[in-house]
Amino acid sequence: MSVNKDIIIALDEGTTNAKAVAFDSHGRVIAQFSRALEIATPQEGWVEQSAELLLAASLEAISRTVAAVGAERVAALAISNQRETVVGWYRETGEAIAPALSWQCSRTPAFCHKLRKQGHEPRIKAVTG
């Protein structure tokens, strides 16, 4: 007997929590899980989060929601994230290079302005889009 893949799970990896919600084929919420996240402000205007905790909270939210509905029923996973929040990961180890720089952080405008003045903007746009 085959099982219908009739569930879509949406992960909202937000600033304050990672939340996964399972929807059935009629758009009804049938399961959900949320894990709170912490924000750090190590200096005035800086906003960052632990990249490892963002990943762990997201994986936990997905895992618990999948467990509630049964993996065999899941057709797809949709992911939304925190705007321009950035995390770099080491390819070899899978560890974060640094904390996640939040979209709320204001530490980089002066650096970006300097790069523009030095003529690097076209290259950066070509590489990053």
Regions flagged by a language model, labelled:
Residues M1-A98, A110, P122:
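N-terminal glycine/serine-rich phosphate-binding loop of ATP-dependent small-molecule kinases
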Residues Q104-G129:
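Glycine-rich phosphate-binding loop plus the immediately following alpha-helix
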